[in-house]
Amino acid sequence: MNNLIVQLETVFSDIILNKDLSSALKNIKDFLAYRGITHYDDRLEEVESGYNLMKDYMSRGYKDEMRESLYFDMLRKLYTVAFDSSKNIQIANGQYYSTAAENSSKINLNEEAISEKFEGYIQDMAMISLQPDSSQRELEEKIIHEHQNYLSVLFDAIVVSPYWNEGISIKMTETLLNPTIDVSDILNLLSAITLSSTSLFDYWRFKTLYNVCLGSSDENVKQRAFVGWAFMLNTYGITLFKEAKNMFAEALDANSDLRRQFYELQLQVIYCSDAEQDNENIQKNIMPDLLRNGNFKITRSGILEQEDDSVSDAINSDDDDKKMEQMEQSFNKMMDMQKQGSDIYFGGFSQMKRFPFFLKISNWFAPFDIDSPYLTSVKAKLGNIKLLDSLYKSTSFCDSDKYSFAFAIISILDQIPDNMREVMNSADFFGMAYDDTNSHTSTYIRRRYLQDLYRFFKLNHYRSEFNSPFIEAQFVDKKIMLLSDFISYEEFSNDILSLAKFSLKHQRWNLLNALLSHFKLTDALVKEKLDYESLKLHYYLKGALLMHRHMYNEACEAYKSLLVLDDSQRMGLDRKLLNFNPATEFIDSPVASIIFENSKESVLKSYALAALRSGDNSLATKCYQILSEKNDAFKYKLYHALALIGVGDVDSALSILFSLDIQNDDANVKRTIAWALLVKADYEKSERYYDKLILSDTIVADDYLNAGYCKWILNKNSEAVISFKNWMSIKKTDDSLREAFNSDHNILNAAGISNIDMKLMIDIVNE
């Protein structure tokens, strides 16, 4: 919830979460009385009278089948009062809101003839040609100026407007679907509705965007309405309105492609939210190579070497080839980022939003138009240079960045040499741009608009007065549209699991956790509603998340559940017989009932690793034995040996390890042999292995620790102290050695090292 309405938090909680009309009435009356606000008294009295009448009927013993429905109607009426009160607080406390309210005070959306105003503008522009030539330009500038002012004021009026009613919704829908109105104006007004709907839910705004999305034949209008409508799915208060949920379901039924677009939009929002991180990556890992290898020109068709007559070119041709290769790799990395949806230009343009044009909030969402009155001075200064035409056709930049570029270029135009001005006239001036041949598709249009929105929510001076719909690390679960209360796991399982797979692939652990925490498995989902493949994927993703969080016992349970499902599916068993535990969300089944020999290798290896990490060496041994028989993989044999050491079968482990050591010169094999020998109490041989590891390039921290054990057991205490100190220098915590000794207590005790010896050694090392 926006911090500007925090004073109303109790009221909203009463209404939305607790559905407590009595408490909500009391709290909002107290709140309004404290602030001296009286113009909601009539609306409050209507709700209170209705509630008192309901109580009176109930006390007399009347049964009313409509009681629950009427109760929720009153809750919604009270919600609109709280909504409007929050707008008042924003106007009282927000710099933009207060200015916008003052500027638009003469506009009442209930009474404003919006369509007529815009149609009048079109007619006035058409009539200019009938005027004398000498006065046409002046008249045109006057009409355009008045129209732009009205558009800006109307934009502000929409943003600060209170809760809408059906009349406003119908009027706005008719305006936004009016084919005679300039599309640029329609797009601007749609952004105003979106901006006014980022915190609290307004059913009539939601319905307006829905009707425009489904009713418009213009893809730009359709997508801008769709983005605003989808963002509203996460706004506070939406759960009060069953009509909104029905509308969402109807939209999916009416448009078979809408579900795909909804999921695609979710991914685009995620990529767009990464713009700052992507910019940091470009600055650190890509731009240095591009700048170092500056003797090349980047064009749309690729990277070309510039002409240079220096003798050094012939002498150092190999170096040039390497530079060319490095530059191509860096350039291609950046282009690949853009193709997958990354906002690669955010960093460059983030410093170019201080021009007067951006002082008006509505201009942040204005479609780029060469004939815009804001570009009149730009065109005059450019003269015959066709930069604006190239900029308009460019498919790389969002509209906001195109305006930034236009204003920035004229500020340095006088410093640009003539030959560079000629290049600016070429169609290839924006050759670095990714040539998106699908620039009129819904995907491209949405991405460009999302970038406009992202720049506003990240860079605008008044951004703190709005609740950004973009994802922040600490608020992942609040910004994911698929986590809306309107989304059910049963209905959206493919999309939810696809996003979860995406999260795992890109190691977005917070997002994966948010998804799996929100969409919990139930008895009905496991035994009936979800298909086998969806269930198995859920458990696989759950296991991966738990492994990442070092919750190895729970990961074992997740992978075991997957294996049980695999067996059940293969044998055609009735899923209703599964013993699902709703508290843990796992399927309870004894390990002995699982047929490991028939299990898929990819699943069994995950289960085996979880068992090994959890310390269940007996289970890990069994799994790796079967995996080694299925696949003669090096890693399976190595982990099998580790598990055997864990169960005390060191000789069998060494047999495997010595064979691996002959086949592969691998440090991890030698490290495991050293550990096995230490466990076996063959301390001298173990010491020799650790001594070699410490002198190698493949040393790891625990080599020092285990070498220290060998030295200590062999009574080489001064060398042991050095090894432990080296290990401590890497661990950098005073308790590390104590924890290590406790963990390896059995090995040390078996070698005759007592608890007192351990305490003394810790003190010596820490001196």
Residue ranges and their predicted role:
Residues 37-41, 217-226, 238-241, 252-265, ...:
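Boundary/linker segments of alpha-helical solenoid repeat arrays
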